[in-house]
């Protein structure tokens, strides 16, 4: 049995697009900072190879991810945002639509889309997941993107 497993490495040139929601920007900026730190420091990716596309809210992320994925210029996409539960069902609908949309785009277009979108019951939970107590979901998304690029490269070489 062959096991395909890869670490985060800097073997190949990588182009990774980041799509980030402006809604809840005070939280999302921490996600972006975490992602960029990982991509530059660990991934050794040049800033010019990391376009950052700002969209109004999390709901708008999938359409931009779809357009970017079809360009075939990027090895991965990182989606960043924050969806906070309110007193309506809006939170549930948005969360489901965004995650389903990104998953479908990833599978359809064979590009890893790393989801660093916080879904939280309240603003305190969101802040904790953006780098205070519970790690940084932006950093985690960047690490996942780097690892997925390497796994896909290994699978492509072993055809």
Swiss-Prot record:
Keyword field: Riboflavin biosynthesis, Transferase
Positions annotated as active site in the UniProt record: 90
Gene3D superfamilies given in the database record: Lumazine/riboflavin synthase (3.40.50.960)
A single GO cellular-component term on record: cytosol
Binding-site list for (2S)-2-hydroxy-3-oxobutyl phosphate: 129
GO-annotated biological processes: riboflavin biosynthetic process
SUPFAM superfamilies: Lumazine synthase
EC number of this enzyme: 2.5.1.78
Catalytic activity: (2S)-2-hydroxy-3-oxobutyl phosphate + 5-amino-6-(D-ribitylamino)uracil = 6,7-dimethyl-8-(1-D-ribityl)lumazine + phosphate + 2 H2O + H(+)
Record Pfam families: DMRL_synthase (PF00885)
Domain of life, source organism: Bacteria
Single Gene Ontology MF annotation: 6,7-dimethyl-8-ribityllumazine synthase activity
Binding site for 5-amino-6-(D-ribitylamino)uracil: 23, 58-60, 82-84, 115
Keyword set includes Ribonucleoprotein: no
Pathway connected to this protein: Cofactor biosynthesis; riboflavin biosynthesis; riboflavin from 2-hydroxy-3-oxobutyl phosphate and 5-amino-6-(D-ribitylamino)uracil: step 1/2
Job of this protein: Catalyzes the formation of 6,7-dimethyl-8-ribityllumazine by condensation of 5-amino-6-(D-ribitylamino)uracil with 3,4-dihydroxy-2-butanone 4-phosphate. This is the penultimate step in the biosynthesis of riboflavin.
Protein family membership: Belongs to the DMRL synthase family.
Subunit structure and binding partners: Forms an icosahedral capsid composed of 60 subunits, arranged as a dodecamer of pentamers.
Name of the molecule in the record: 6,7-dimethyl-8-ribityllumazine synthase
Gene: ribH
């Amino acid at each position: 049995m062959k096991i395909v497993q890869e670490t985060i490495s800097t073997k190949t040139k990588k182009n990774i697009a980041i799509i980030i929601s402006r809604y809840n920007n005070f939280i999302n900026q921490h996600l972006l900072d975490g992602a960029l730190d990982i991509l530059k420091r660990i991934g050794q990716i040049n800033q010019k190879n990391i376009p950052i596309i700002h969209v109004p809210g999390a709901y708008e992320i999938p359409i931009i991810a779809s357009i970017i994925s079809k360009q075939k210029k990027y090895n991965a996409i990182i989606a960043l945002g924050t969806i906070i539960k309110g007193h309506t069902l809006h939170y549930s609908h948005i969360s489901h639509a965004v995650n389903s949309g990104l998953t479908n785009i990833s599978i359809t277009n064979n590009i890893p889309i790393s989801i660093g979108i916080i879904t939280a019951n309240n603003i305190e939970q969101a802040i904790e997941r953006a780098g205070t107590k519970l790690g940084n979901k932006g950093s985690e998304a960047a690490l996942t993107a780097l690892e997925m690029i390497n796994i896909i490269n290994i699978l492509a070489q072993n055809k």
